[in-house]
Amino acid sequence: MFRRGGRILNRRIFGAGISAFRVQGRKCASDLSKALASGPKFSDFLKGDKEEQLKPEEAYELEENVVLPNGSVHKRLPSWLKTKVPLGTNFNKIKNDLRGLNLHTVCEEARCPNMGECWGGKDKTRATATIMLMGDTCTRGCRFCSIKTSRKPPPLDPNEPEKTAEAIKRWGLGYVVLTSVDRDDLADAGASHIAKTISLIKSKAPQVLVEALTPDFSGNLDLVSHVAKSGLDVFAHNVETVEELTPFVRDRRANFRQSLRVLKHAKSVSPHLITKTSIMLGLGETDEEIEATLGELRKNEVDVVTFGQYMRPTKRHMKVQAYITPDKFEHWRKRAEELGFLYVASGPLVRSSYKAGEFYLTNILRRRTAAKAQADH
């Protein structure tokens, strides 16, 4: 245990009992090394057993139980974290097409709570789907993510870019998000595969807005450029958490500063791009750390930020440290807007791609309407 600002701090990060040690805002290097060494290893995430997946109430279970004033222990899932069962014609059509084309979505693989809402948008032009490229197996083992992990995933499907573009054209969506697993085993980390998919979508369905949620390409900025110049509208890369918690949350090959460089470089080579990132809350971060993170993102010209509640996917992953209330999410939305972000989506169930089309389009239309009104005066 250590003291920070007069209080004892011993924040437990993983269910396995790893602690994040801090001394007056800085990590103690030796204790950080010990904590990382004793935590889940890359091999612990290889070929995850689906039977370990948690129920929603378990996924949001707190690391430490909250004792209420009457002495009872709080374990019930807050009402704002409950969602409806996915239904709807558009939802079923997208799901069936995915099966027929052997495509994957991060919506399903990451067990997103908003799948039915996004896929079943009020009309096709408002519906959003997030296609996961390069298979369903990642070469990294982040401590928050439920995607399968392997040192040597299966080879890429050379027909995937064409099949993806055809599916998007068939669905008639207004907005599509492309994400991918990390493929550190490939010479270009999959950059050419992602870029080809984007180009084909724009060729087959030029009306579709395309967002790409990319890996960090191990910091190779030439690969970042290749994707950024491929015709997409939104370049997204997630920092996931505050800098102080990054070593505990993300794979050890990921780096907060590296992620900032990726986002800034994408904007520098394609100034028209909207750049976007996402932050999970409830991992044990402090308000000061969130504030500093937002400042760094703006310094690196990031346009859009989203905030959502961390959800634990399996028992091998980190436990939730805190339920962040809707009021607190609203606080961070307002604060981010004050700092100059073009758009902010903030809420307990928001994910990096949550109803991206609706948020993006609504914001752009609002700006155009305001500009027209000003011109008329």
Swiss-Prot record:
Catalytic activity: [[Fe-S] cluster scaffold protein carrying a second [4Fe-4S](2+) cluster] + N(6)-octanoyl-L-lysyl-[protein] + 2 oxidized [2Fe-2S]-[ferredoxin] + 2 S-adenosyl-L-methionine + 4 H(+) = [[Fe-S] cluster scaffold protein] + N(6)-[(R)-dihydrolipoyl]-L-lysyl-[protein] + 4 Fe(3+) + 2 hydrogen sulfide + 2 5'-deoxyadenosine + 2 L-methionine + 2 reduced [2Fe-2S]-[ferredoxin]
Protein species of origin: Schizosaccharomyces japonicus (strain yFS275 / FY16936) (Fission yeast)
Gene Ontology terms for molecular function: 4 iron, 4 sulfur cluster binding; lipoate synthase activity; metal ion binding
UniProt name for this protein: Lipoyl synthase, mitochondrial
CDD domains in the cross-refs: Radical_SAM
GO CC term (a single one): mitochondrion
Range of the transit peptide: 1-77
Keyword flag 4Fe-4S: yes
Pathway: Protein modification; protein lipoylation via endogenous pathway; protein N(6)-(lipoyl)lysine from octanoyl-[acyl-carrier-protein]: step 2/2
